[in-house]
Swiss-Prot record:
This is Esculentin-2JDb. Pfam families: Antimicrobial_2 (PF08023). Belongs to the frog skin active peptide (FSAP) family. Esculentin subfamily. Keywords: Amphibian defense peptide, Antibiotic, Antimicrobial, Disulfide bond, Secreted. The keyword Disulfide bond applies.
Amino acid sequence: GIFTLIKGAAKLIGKTVAKEAGKTGLELMACKITNQC
């Protein structure tokens, strides 16, 4: 029902946020290593 829908949406949003955060984190680490910040 509606609860499953909300749970599915939350999981999808969580995945997207985690992916974006991971990408940003990697870019931050890379620029720190190369002193390009």
